[in-house]
Design a protein with these regions (language model features):
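GNAT-family acyltransferases
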Residues: 1-123
Length: 123
């Protein structure tokens, strides 16, 4: 049984590695030199490491181990990670990524969402 009309599909574009600007925050491709200090400071607000419970990485006990994580090639391809900057807090306080990026079939997922305590439950 045919449902609807056939759709002509052209290969989708790979996501741009540009800054994504929103009303309350912006996302930038992860840059360890620029973002690591803020991110580590803000993620360290979670003293028990609870925010990392369902993540396959972290929590990070030292700044150097966290910065090393941010510099891995795993964060710049597929998945592709962004640092989240809160305009209200004026600091980088989260991570998010695109993953399972398949332009040839037009699919993409969002994941690895990690908000520091000071970003959780905010607008």
């Amino acid at each position: 049984m045919k449902i609807g009309f056939s759709v002509k599909f052209n290969k989708a574009k790979y996501p741009s590695k540009k800054k994504l600007i929103g009303k309350y925050c912006f996302l930038e491709p992860v840059n360890a030199k620029k973002h690591a200090k803020d991110l580590y400071k803000n993620f360290s607000l979670d003293k028990k490491g609870i925010d990392w419970t369902y993540m396959p990485t972290g929590p990070y006990k030292t700044f150097s181990s966290f910065k090393k994580y941010l510099t891995t090639d795993k964060l710049s391809g597929n998945p592709f990670f962004y640092s989240i900057y809160s305009k209200r807090l004026k600091t980088y306080c989260g991570l998010a990524s695109y993953l399972r990026i398949k332009p040839e079939i037009g699919t993409i997922e969002v994941g690895w969402i990690t908000y520091a305590k000071n970003l959780q439950r905010t607008v």
